[in-house]
UniProtKB/Swiss-Prot annotation:
GO BP: glycyl-tRNA aminoacylation
Pfam families: tRNA-synt_2e (PF02091)
Gene this protein is translated from: glyQ
Subunit record text: Tetramer of two alpha and two beta subunits.
Subcellular location per the Swiss-Prot or TrEMBL entry: Cytoplasm
E.C. number(s) listed in UniProt: 6.1.1.14
Keywords linked to the UniProt accession: Aminoacyl-tRNA synthetase, ATP-binding, Cytoplasm, Ligase, Nucleotide-binding, Protein biosynthesis
Name this polypeptide is given: Glycine--tRNA ligase alpha subunit
Reaction catalyzed: tRNA(Gly) + glycine + ATP = glycyl-tRNA(Gly) + AMP + diphosphate
Length: 319
């Protein structure tokens, strides 16, 4: 057992720190996602004017990055620690540096750089200005201010901080391979994840059923559209996440051409936009219950509020 902070310790310290800063500790979302951003705790909640602070670990699946467990740093599944704060605090960068200090990484003792790297997720219609955070030459975090989510301009800027837990732990424990990381209590990362990594790589590159996946894509898209029309936001969003994962599996398998790839991404993006709009509408109908500021409530749902007008138009259109 190493005396250095285990991956489990890193997670516990980050959870404790961000809870102290007002974040709600959520659990990993129980669906296939390619990044913490795709969790509804980020993607959906970044829409609309309501404040929202959350932190959670999110296992993230990226089929094309699998390497059968042979590469020390490229993985089918890695873990992100996701923090979202909306509206973004003015001192968010200082808060982030404070989280590194909690992990024993003081800014005065390390070369910590914010390297401009504006971020975009084309298939989900999400984008923002941002930075990669480099710790002594290694990228450990992506820092983003959302400008658009679901192809919709945001009402309130969300700050997103995404820690790459394997990278951060590799630096802290000073190991070259993620499989040599201590997860916790003397149990190694490789003991838990190396076999699944190999098996998922075999499936993604060699054994996935292309015909079935293509059929599933069409079926899940149709179901997402049906559920969206019914106003069932969260079940519909689950199917959009499944669409995204199936597309990633098809892409890893080499089953889609460059032209087809753009078409599939457009279909996912269209659904993401539709569900983002439906989520905002649903929250507006509820009166944006998390929005407590009286001036902001007047701005968005007062007699002449932005969403009061939008809801009136929607009701008139549906009548």
């Amino acid at each position: 057992m190493t005396k250095k902070m285990s991956m489990q310790d890193i997670i516990l310290n980050l959870q404790e720190y961000w809870a102290e800063q007002g974040a709600n500790l959520m659990q990993a979302y129980d669906n296939e996602v390619g990044a913490g951003t795709q969790s509804p705790y980020t993607f959906l909640r970044a829409n609309g004017p309501e404040p929202w602070n959350a932190a959670y670990v999110q296992p993230s699946r990226r089929p094309a990055d699998g390497r059968y467990g042979h590469n020390p740093n490229r993985l089918f599944q890695h873990h992100q620690f996701q923090v979202v704060m909306k509206p973004s605090p003015e001192n968010i960068q200082e808060l982030y540096l404070g989280s590194l200090t909690r992990l024993g990484l003081k800014a005065s003792e390390h070369d910590i750089r914010f390297v401009e790297d504006n971020w975009e997720n084309p298939s989900m219609g999400a984008a923002g200005i941002g930075w990669e955070v480099w710790l002594d030459g290694m990228e450990v975090t992506q820092f983003t201010y959302f400008q658009q989510v679901g192809s919709i301009e945001v009402d309130s800027v969300t700050a997103e901080i995404t820690y790459g837990l394997e990278r951060l732990a590799s630096y802290i424990q000073d190991v070259l391979s993620v499989y040599d990381l201590e997860w916790g209590n003397g149990v190694m990362y490789g003991d838990i994840f190396k076999e699944p990594e190999y098996e998922h790589s075999v499936y993604s590159f060699d054994q996935s059923d292309e015909k079935m996946l293509l059929e599933n894509f069409d079926q899940y898209e149709a179901e997402a559209k049906r559920l969206t029309k019914l106003g069932l936001v969260h079940p519909a969003y689950d199917y959009i996440l499944k669409l995204s994962h199936i597309f990633n599996l098809l892409d890893a398998r080499g089953a889609v051409s460059v032209t087809e790839r753009a078409g599939y991404m457009h279909r996912i993006r269209s659904m993401a936009r539709a569900i983002a709009r439906e989520f905002i509408t649903a929250r507006a109908k509820l009166g944006f219950p998390l929005l407590k500021d009286s001036k902001l409530r007047e701005k968005y749902i007062g007699e002449k509020g932005i969403y009061t007008k939008k809801l009136a138009k929607k009701i008139k259109k549906e009548a």
